């Protein structure tokens, strides 16, 4: 094609493009123009540049094939906990809330059609209604949220409950933006609970002093927990666990909540910056693409992959390393997004912009916050590039959640306010009582054992020591007297096996839980608290640590054994980390042997239909001394079971 012909051909193309634009087919012209530019690039770019591009595209394609965020499977419960209290509640709840509250009450879903028959056939303890948009699978769609209006059927329901002297409670989870939409409904109830404590004075104008209380969001450990596989697949990990890097799930508002939009732009731009470094970033848009007022800005659009229903979002929570978060309400001491509690409980870190609520609920060591674009980018980079930092922060957040911010804590508050017997909640949330058992044939290790047990926090401990072939010295007895309120010493003969000695300790135990300690290992202060928390959210017959730190004295090395086994349903955990209900130890006595008693104990638990859960890796160090151990395993073989993380004995490395 000569030069004149090329000019004529190009001119013809321009005329065609002009005609198409006048016809309104601008998008088509852009697509064709892009193709032409790419074709020109392919014909004229140097080979090395095209080859580099192809290699990068192939790598990106492989990454995309390895993890597709929208293909997340529907959520399956990974907890065996089944301790639902007996309080009977008639409820009207949206799906998110129902998934959390249904484990705290014996719930009955009221609808406009069934409420009379349900009241007639049940003896309810309370009526619990939230600021529902859909309510009980759509049965109450838009009926509760009409400003200044009360749904007549709901009015009949509330009246009926009051006639039967059954307390009624309304929970507005949409305060303060939607206060006016729900106040007409809320003021019918005996008590009003609000996610924003700043709104209490407003509600008290309608329901009276003391009848309006704060009730923030929380986590439900049965569905929000860090388990990485299912109980019926021990040792088989979830292949999608933390395969994504950064995620955001929520909405973008162009024309309202300006402070939220400003904060979200900061976090989204930081995520996009890291996405350009080849980190995977996914935006799950709650409002979709239909409304232009809710469309994400152009810089973020390439990362908007769609939306997920809540049952799929529960799975997605476990599939990304970091979620970014903003809060619609930025001045409340108690109102914040659900994900502040739910996502860390699932084992995923959260980066959020700070509000009074986030500062009120979590310390800086438990939740990472960013105040501007600089700290947002640096904090997000640290969370992605430093797993050790990310895991420790998240572990501390989980501990705070298990101790203060579960729906069991919220249900206790509701029950107390309404005058409903709350003994069941209080018993389950009480300080756990643990009998620590240890059999030792080394008098020199008694002070070390006492020190390890005495420094446990947030638990009540009974110590039971089997002295194998010796009696305690007077100094040891004095040390025990000064340290413990409750302890027992069982003197056992040298002819007794280690298994028999441990059974003798179990027989002397008095508390609900039993924990087996070794006399030379390191148990950091939160060890027992964390193990009991793990036992509660997992519902396992036995918990322990398969992923655990160990110090190999001959190499002066601190290693992490089996790191891939953290938070896994399994058939094995380390013997010095056994923790379980006393009933498990009674039903599965140790065999009368001195080696292999731990392995046979675990086999007995599994063969009896029990389940074993390997918890976190923190707050325990197994000691492997130069002078040997009961294990018949060379140091090199031992080191081959994990990775060396530091040199020199360093408790702080294992602490969280």
Predicted feature residues:
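Nucleotide-sugar donor-binding catalytic core of glycosyltransferases
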Residues: 57-122, 131-142, 146-153, 195-341, ...
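Conserved catalytic core of nucleotide-sugar-dependent glycosyltransferases
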Residues: 525-596
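N-proximal low-complexity "stem/linker" segments adjacent to membrane-targeting elements
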Residues: 413-454
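C-terminal catalytic/acceptor-binding lobe
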Residues: 395, 588-656
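A charged, aromatic-enriched C-terminal amphipathic alpha-helix characteristic of glycosyltransferases
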Residues: 388-418
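N-terminal pre-catalytic "stem/leader" segment of glycosyltransferase-like enzymes
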Residues: 12-156, 162-167, 173-179, 183, ...
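Short beta-strand-to-loop acidic/aromatic patch adjacent to the donor-nucleotide binding site
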Residues: 511-522
């Amino acid at each position: 094609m000569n030069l004149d012909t090329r000019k004529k051909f190009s001119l013809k193309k321009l005329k065609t493009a002009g005609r198409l634009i006048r016809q309104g087919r601008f998008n088509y012209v852009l697509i064709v123009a892009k193709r032409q530019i790419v074709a020109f690039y392919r014909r004229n770019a140097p080979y090395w540049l095209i080859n580099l591009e192809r290699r990068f595209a192939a790598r990106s394609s492989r990454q995309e094939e390895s993890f597709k965020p929208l293909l997340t499977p529907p959520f399956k419960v990974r907890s065996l906990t089944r301790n639902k209290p007996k309080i009977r509640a008639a409820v009207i709840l949206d799906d998110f809330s129902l998934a959390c509250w249904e484990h705290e009450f014996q719930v009955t879903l009221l609808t406009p059609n069934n409420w009379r028959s349900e009241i007639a056939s049940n003896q309810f303890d309370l009526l619990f209604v939230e600021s529902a948009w859909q309510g009980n699978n759509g049965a109450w769609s838009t009926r509760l949220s009409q400003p200044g209006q009360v749904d007549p059927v709901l009015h009949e329901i509330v009246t009926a409950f009051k006639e039967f002297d059954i307390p009624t409670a309304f929970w507005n989870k949409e305060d303060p933006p939607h206060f006016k939409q729900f106040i007409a409904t809320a003021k019918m109830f005996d008590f009003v609970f609000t996610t924003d404590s700043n709104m209490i004075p407003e509600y008290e104008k309608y329901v009276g002093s003391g009848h309006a209380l704060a009730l923030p969001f929380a986590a439900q450990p049965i569905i929000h927990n860090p388990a990485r596989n299912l109980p019926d697949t021990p040792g088989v990990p979830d292949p999608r666990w933390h395969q994504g890097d950064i995620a955001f799930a929520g909405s973008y508002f162009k024309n309202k909540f300006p402070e939220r939009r400003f904060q979200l732009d900061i976090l989204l731009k930081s995520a996009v910056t890291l996405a350009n470094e080849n980190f995977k970033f996914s935006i799950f848009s709650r409002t979709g693409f239909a409304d232009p007022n809710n469309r994400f800005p152009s810089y973020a659009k390439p990362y908007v992959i769609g939306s997920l229903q809540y049952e799929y979002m529960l799975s997605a929570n476990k599939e990304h390393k970091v979620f970014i978060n903003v809060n619609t309400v930025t001045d409340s001491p108690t109102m914040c997004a659900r994900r502040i509690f739910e996502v860390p409980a699932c084992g995923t870190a959260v980066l959020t912009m700070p509000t009074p609520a986030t500062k009120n609920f979590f310390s800086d060591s438990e939740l990472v916050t960013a105040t501007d674009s600089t700290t947002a980018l640096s904090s997000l980079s640290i969370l992605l590039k430093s797993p050790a930092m990310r895991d420790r922060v998240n572990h501390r957040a989980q501990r705070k959640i298990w101790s203060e911010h579960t729906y069991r804590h919220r249900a206790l508050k509701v029950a107390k306010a309404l005058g409903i017997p709350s003994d069941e909640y209080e018993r389950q949330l009480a300080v756990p009582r643990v009998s620590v058992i240890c059999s030792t044939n080394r008098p020199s290790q008694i002070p070390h054992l006492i020190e390890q047990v005495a420094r446990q926090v947030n638990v009540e401990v009974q110590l039971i020591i089997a002295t194998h072939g010796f009696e305690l010295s007077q100094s040891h007895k004095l040390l025990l007297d000064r340290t413990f309120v409750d302890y027992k010493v069982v003197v056992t003969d040298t002819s007794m096996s280690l298994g028999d000695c441990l059974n003798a300790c179990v027989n002397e135990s008095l508390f609900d839980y039993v924990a087996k300690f070794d006399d030379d290992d390191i148990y950091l202060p939160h060890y027992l608290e964390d193990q009991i928390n793990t036992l509660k959210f997992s519902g396992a017959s036995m918990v322990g640590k398969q992923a655990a730190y160990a110090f190999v004295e001959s190499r002066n090395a601190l290693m992490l054994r089996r790191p891939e086994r953290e938070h896994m349903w399994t058939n094995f955990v380390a013997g010095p980390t056994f923790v379980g209900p006393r009933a498990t130890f009674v039903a599965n006595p140790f065999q009368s042997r001195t080696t292999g008693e731990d392995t046979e104990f675990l086999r007995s638990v599994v063969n009896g239909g029990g389940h074993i859960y390997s918890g976190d890796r923190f707050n325990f160090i197994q000691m492997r001394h130069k002078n040997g151990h009961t294990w018949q395993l060379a140091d090199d073989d031992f080191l081959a079971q994990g990775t060396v993380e530091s040199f020199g004995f360093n408790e702080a490395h294992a602490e969280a």
